[in-house]
């Protein structure tokens, strides 16, 4: 990865609600981490300091939020097309809870791809990208959240190999 530095901060008891991140507050739902793209900052729940594999998986996921915004429209549309094909094939599962939870919510909102331009769809595609990157690059080979079928995993891995074949991943 290459780009300007990204600061990392550990805080206790992270929760999030309506795109806000809290520490030690009774607001929102528990989360592992959050990224602030413009501020170039990642905040991680302090509990992960004692879980190196989970920390690696979560950190890679968060770093790829920075990669997503630098990816450019053609590559983002290409990845979206891959995910759209999975959706049309009714692929079950995902490569992380971030994408899985959004995919489940989308099933209730979208019965066809007419809503594919919605913010919910775009958020799902981004989370899918970040969870897939964490699966590929974190070194965590097995996890209970890796539920996407092998054939779809293989297609995503090939997409990443092709997209980033020329060197460093810009963040």
Whereabouts are the PLM-identified features?
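Metalloprotease/metallohydrolase-associated module, dominated by Zn2+-dependent proteases
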Residues: 1-4, 17-32, 76-171
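Active-site scaffold of zinc-dependent metalloenzymes
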Residues: 11-81
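Generic structural signal for residues in well-ordered beta-strands
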Residues: 6-10
């Amino acid at each position: 990865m290459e780009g300007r530095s990204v600061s990392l901060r550990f805080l206790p008891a992270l929760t999030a609600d309506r795109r806000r991140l809290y520490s030690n507050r009774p607001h929102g739902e528990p989360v592992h981490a959050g990224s602030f793209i413009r501020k170039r900052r990642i905040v991680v729940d302090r509990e992960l300091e004692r879980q190196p594999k989970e920390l690696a998986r979560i950190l890679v996921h968060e770093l790829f939020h920075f990669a997503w915004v630098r990816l450019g429209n053609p590559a983002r549309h290409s990845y979206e097309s891959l995910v759209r094909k999975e959706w049309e094939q009714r692929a079950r599962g995902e490569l992380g809870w971030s994408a899985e939870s959004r995919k489940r919510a989308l099933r209730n909102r979208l019965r066809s791809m007419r809503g594919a331009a919605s913010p919910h769809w775009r958020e799902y595609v981004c989370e899918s990208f970040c969870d897939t990157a964490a699966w590929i690059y974190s070194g965590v080979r097995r996890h209970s959240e890796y539920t996407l079928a092998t054939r779809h995993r293989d297609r995503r891995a090939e997409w990443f190999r092709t997209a980033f074949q020329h060197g460093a991943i810009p963040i």
